[in-house]
Amino acid sequence: MPQLWQGRASKAVDSRVNDFNSSIRFDARMIEQDIQGSLVHSAMLGRQGIISQQDVDDIHKGLHSILDDLHSGALEIDPNAEDVHTFVEQTLTARVGDAGKRLHTGRSRNDQVALDIRLNLRAASEHIQGQIKELITVLCDQAEKGAGYVMPGYTHLQRAQPVTFGHQLMAYAWMLLRDLGRLQDATRRMDAECPLGSGALAGTTYPLDRFYTAEQLGFAAPCGNSIDGVSDRDFCIELCSAMATCMMHLSRLSEEIILWCSWEFKFIELDDAFTTGSSIMPQKKNPDVTELIRGKTGRVYGDLNTLLVMMKGIPLAYDKDMQEDKEAIFDAVDTLELCLRTVTPMLATMTPLPANMRRAAAKGFINATDCADYLTKKGMPFRDAYKCTGTMVAACIREGKTLEELTLDEFKQYSDLFAEDVYTAIDLTTCCEGRTSYGGPTKASVLRQVSEVKGKLA
């Protein structure tokens, strides 16, 4: 397939350069968006009297026929085409003749590709947002069921204070809600400015109606500067950053799932459909889904780094370096979509094991803070109460006891403020339900969080 730009060249381009220069293998996924932009651009050319209405009709008929063939599977994309724009234009011209040659009037591939990427990422962002909402809903449903399942909360991966399974899961729901907001914000900024009509960099001499094309394509307005219009890839970086942050949250959740389903914790059981086995160890039930999410997170970080490094030193306006944006951003999109598609049903089908959680919570003195708070509420300064409780814990460790196993006389050896009600104060359920501060682990708080988060998804 010949290049669109061969008018000046005195020699045919070396085949190795053609192979090196071609982007059709990764930008062909934008073919629907390329056609969408061309339909609107050609309609505008007709409205402005730049091309005839007959040309517009022929162009639209040809573009729709390409779309029909694409959807039916009959369209064969030429792997030798330089890029998706070349393929569409030359396929169109082969079908409708000279009208196809008029499509590119007042347009450059520079503003064309800047538009296509935006349209493609808009659709991708909307799809990912829907996936995140589904995952948040699953987390909320599991949290609602586990709102009363007491488990250890951890700092430094050491047992720290009692929380509930529902409270822990809702932490991830809130993280993902922020991810949803970041994607929405980035998409809103991307949709604020339409680059179509910027030309190669300096606009055009044709009387284009850029406000018409911007409106028809779902943008708030045309971009205010034609050089910025073709040079901008901020939207790729911002969306990729939002996706990388989401992957980070999925990776943290995955790490906890990996721990929780191990025999060392056994807080949950993953459905067999979402685990794998070993070729040599018959007892194994491996959480491969979560391990792959953890690994793929680094891949999306790499995509973001690629975009940042690619853009950091190139002068205005368009440079061929920018062709490398698509593989990075599309890989980030595909990776996040794949992870979300897999992790959501995995979490929906996991089985919590509350008895194991409770047994783990009974170890490690995670009610020590509550013991110190008990003394503080009896009038002892908190720092003294902290020291007193620490001394008690050290003694219990030496003697192989828990705080609950101390007699009242033993408690009183450390402070006369202890009374019979200390046993209620350090009961694990009481510890959770007593933390009534907003956002805490009480059952009522978890259920309120579930309701609030689900309300934000509506």
What are these regions (language model features)?
Residues 117, 122, 129, 144, ...:
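Charged, flexible cofactor/metal-binding loops and thiol motifs
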Residues 1-189, 193, 199, 203, ...:
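A helix-coil-helix interface module used to build multimeric assemblies
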Residues 38, 85, 89, 236-239, ...:
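Short runs of predominantly hydrophobic/aromatic residues within well-ordered alpha helices
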Residues 40-43, 119, 123, 237-241, ...:
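Positions in alpha-helical segments
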